[in-house]
């Protein structure tokens, strides 16, 4: 797909990785809908920077992706504002750090909220955008999962299971939406400078990075570049690419 003039909806577009994805897409000439859940001012700042730096149309849109009615409203507003919708990036996520062995503190309320945002939310969005993309004859969907979805590690069981579900949802939707819409997934490892590492001490980040083959955290720009590649591809679908500096092998 030629990204110049395409319209991309990026959920969590005001976050650390989300911002990099927005910039990478705009750099290719794509117009960007920056979706946020709470930080309107931050999202509007991202949209303004995209518009001024890359001369593209970029706007901020608020949405609680756990709410089906809000998702339908969001897709309608984006389609009306831009006149089309070619790309969906499911980057919005939620987590509560709970050690795997601490099942007493893994409440069903926490489980339900994590699943609602990390798995059901992307499903709602995919269902909402699918008819728009089908009518146009092509579309690209990229889900942002995690290496926690590939092995029983990470900051909580609920988060790991939600990301495992998102990886398999990618495969299932690749089948369901073929041949018009291609669906792929990026599974990052620990990313420095994101919400996930903001709550960690520097020595914790360094210790985690040192356990990777490349002895450093995964790179947000590498992830964003892979998202762009998945949007441009014509023959790749149903795939998950891990970007974690080789930490998954430890």
Residue ranges of each PLM-predicted region?
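Residue(s) in the substrate-gating loop at a strand-loop-helix junction
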Residues: 146
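Alpha-helical segment proximal to the catalytic Tyr-Lys
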Residues: 131, 174-179
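C-terminal substrate-recognition "lid" of short-chain dehydrogenase/reductases
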Residues: 2, 138, 178, 219-243, ...
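Substrate-binding pocket helix/loop in short-chain dehydrogenase/reductase
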Residues: 99-103, 107-112, 141, 197, ...
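Active-site helix of classical SDR
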Residues: 126, 162, 170
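The beta1-alpha1 cofactor-binding region of Rossmann-like NAD(H)/NADP(H)-dependent oxidoreductases
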Residues: 40-41, 61-74, 108, 221
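Conserved glycine-rich cofactor-binding loop
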Residues: 7, 14-15
């Amino acid at each position: 797909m030629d990204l110049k003039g395409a319209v991309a909806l990026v959920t969590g577009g005001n976050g650390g990785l989300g911002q990099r994805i927005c910039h990478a897409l705009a750099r290719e000439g794509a117009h960007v809908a920056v979706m946020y859940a709470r930080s309107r001012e931050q999202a509007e700042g991202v949209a303004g920077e995209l518009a001024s730096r890359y001369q593209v149309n970029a706007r901020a849109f608020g949405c609680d992706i756990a709410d089906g009615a809000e998702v339908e409203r969001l897709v309608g507003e984006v389609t009306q504002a831009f006149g089309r919708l070619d790309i969906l990036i499911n980057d919005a996520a939620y987590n509560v750090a709970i050690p795997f062995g601490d099942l007493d503190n893994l409440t069903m309320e926490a489980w339900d909220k994590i699943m609602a945002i990390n798995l059901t939310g992307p499903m709602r969005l995919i269902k909402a955008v699918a008819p728009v993309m089908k009518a146009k004859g092509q579309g690209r969907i990229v889900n942002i999962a995690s290496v926690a979805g590939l092995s029983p590690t990470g900051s909580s069981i609920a988060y790991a299971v939600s990301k495992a579900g998102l990886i398999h949802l990618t495969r299932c939707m690749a089948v369901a939406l073929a041949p018009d819409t291609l669906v792929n997934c990026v599974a990052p490892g620990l990313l420095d400078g994101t919400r996930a590492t903001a709550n960690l001490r520097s020595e914790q980040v360094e210790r985690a990075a040192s356990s990777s083959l490349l002895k450093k955290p995964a790179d947000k720009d590498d992830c964003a570049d892979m998202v762009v590649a998945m949007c441009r591809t014509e023959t790749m679908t149903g795939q998950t690419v891990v970007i974690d500096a080789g930490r998954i092998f430890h």
